[in-house]
Structures are given as C-alpha cells and as structure tokens.
Amino acid sequence: MTTQTVSGRRYFTKAWLMEQKSLIALLVLIAIVSTLSPNFFTINNLFNILQQTSVNAIMAVGMTLVILTSGIDLSVGSLLALTGAVAASIVGIEVNALVAVAAALALGAAIGAVTGVIVAKGRVQAFIATLVMMLLLRGVTMVYTNGSPVNTGFTENADLFGWFGIGRPLGVPTPVWIMGIVFLAAWYMLHHTRLGRYIYALGGNEAATRLSGINVNKIKIIVYSLCGLLASLAGIIEVARLSSAQPTAGTGYELDAIAAVVLGGTSLAGGKGRIVGTLIGALILGFLNNGLNLLGVSSYYQMIVKAVVILLAVLVDNKKQ
C-alpha cells in the first residue's frame, strides 16, 4: 500500500467524520445521558422529546432555507406568537378549525413575503429587516391580544384543532408526523427541484447567480415566505397543544432555530448545509434540554451549557471553512 493511498484514506476518514460530526455528537449525547439517567431512554420519554422538539425543528427548516441564501430571520418567534393568537381567536369564535389553520398559515406566508420584499427589493440587510419585523410583530401581537392569553375554548371544534398538538395517529404524536413530513418535503425541494438548486447557488455566490439570469429577488421572497409559513405552522402546533395562545409565546425561539441550523452543520455564510443536519441539530437541543431536566440541572446552568455547545459548533464551522 502506497503512502499516497494511506494519506488519501486518512483524508477521506477525516472528511467523513467532519461531515457526520452532528450525528456523532447526538449519539454520544444519548449514550451519556442514558447512562446517567435510567428514565431517559424510554419510549414515552423519546416521544415526549420528539413532540417538544417538533416546534423548534419545523421553525429550523425555514431558518435553514433562509441561512442557505446567506440571510437570517429573527422575526420567526414573534410571527409564531401572532399567527398562533390569530388561529386561537378564530377557533374561539367557533369557526371551523381547518379555516383557522389555513388563515394562520396564509398570514405567516404573507408576512414572510413582506420581509422578503424588504430584504430583496429594499436592499435592507436581513439582520436589520428581520429585527424590525420581530419588534413590530411582537407589538402587533400585544395589541391584538391586549396582552392576555387567547383560549381556544372547549368545543368540539376546539378538540379538532387540538388534534394538531396532542393527537396520536397510529400511536405517534401528530407534531412528530408533521415534523417528519416537513423535513421530507424540504429535503426533496432542496435536492430535486430547480428552486433548491437556486437556493444553494444564491448562497454560494449571489452575483454569479444574478448574472446567470436567475431572479434572485424572487428566490429571496419565496424563501422568507416559506420561513414565515413554517413559523406559523409551529405556532399552530404549540397553541393546539396548550389550548391557548400566549402573547409572549415564541420569545427566544429564533435563537433556538438558528442554533439547530448551526449545530446541523449549515454554514452561516450560506450556500452549504443539509436539511438532515438541521433535524439532527434540533434533536441535539431537544435531547440536551430533556437530559439536563432529568438530571435536575438548573435552568440557569442549562442556558450556559447550550451557549457553550453552540459556540463550539460555530468554531468547528469556521475551522471547516
């Protein structure tokens, strides 16, 4: 065996390990927490983790699309709160639950499109544009709800709406089914459609993408609209699970979504990343939160641990770049 062959294999092994670092981290985390807590690796707890992770994971899909285009969206948490409140209020006046879901999804997509227009047409930096939208939407939510929770009520229609949060088709929680469908759809779009190729191209080199004749502004608007749609879907699930919409819901959720994307290996510079990695990143956060809770770790220390994990992920990403 030649020195060149050995060197090539070592390089391949190192590259493979770097590519699978998120999955390896998840498996190591599961092994450690399972050893420390006998109640961790049980069917009920695993379903509980997946159900709690679903909201962040769905939001993280939309965030992945935005970050792949070299953008960011800080407004998703506020958008979740607003669309969730709208859905709850519609269900509360006994309008069909499916109408409430459709209205919330349409509102989320429309607001996301507005954000996209500001970024693409207005040429405002994504950080600034979405920071403004975050504050604006939070204020609108407070005005709409008068700062009070919006309950869905206890009617048959409310029970139908609640299925999106606490239903268990075939014994699996509805949010887990929805999360799986969203990830499969996003994976297919990114790897088997023209839009997916354009998203990667835009994040890789916007100037070259524009010169090749692709409507860059249209792609940005679509991506932010999809991000808004998925944020509203996450809001529907959360409200359906709790039977009420809190005006402060979603606070800090944008950071969790970004963390899941970064932990999954998507580059903050855009153009590089995998939707499967985002799912793994969301699961890492979900398992980490659940494990620390089972071990009785204070919520204050949990924030510190999460911050360290995210920082390490960013440092690894920078080294890879």
From Swiss-Prot:
Residues 44-56, 146-168, 241-294 are periplasmic. Disruption phenotype: Disruption confers resistance to cellular contact-dependent growth inhibition (CDI) CdiA of D.dadantii strain 3937, but not to several other tested CdiA toxins. Keywords: Cell inner membrane, Cell membrane, Membrane, Sugar transport, Transmembrane, Transmembrane helix, Transport. Its main location: membrane. It comes from the Bacteria. The chain crosses the membrane at residues 23-43, 57-77, 126-145, 169-190, 221-240, 295-316. GO terms for biological process: D-ribose transmembrane transport. One of its GO terms (molecular function) is D-ribose transmembrane transporter activity. It is found in: Cell inner membrane. Residues 1-22, 78-125, 191-220, 317-321 are cytoplasmic. GO terms for cellular component: ATP-binding cassette (ABC) transporter complex; ATP-binding cassette (ABC) transporter complex, substrate-binding subunit-containing; membrane; plasma membrane. InterPro entries: ABC_transp_permease. It is a multi-pass membrane protein. Belongs to the binding-protein-dependent transport system permease family. AraH/RbsC subfamily. The complex is composed of an ATP-binding protein (RbsA), two transmembrane proteins (RbsC) and a solute-binding protein (RbsB). Part of the ABC transporter complex RbsABC involved in ribose import. Probably responsible for the translocation of the substrate across the membrane. This is Ribose import permease protein RbsC. It comes from Escherichia coli (strain K12).
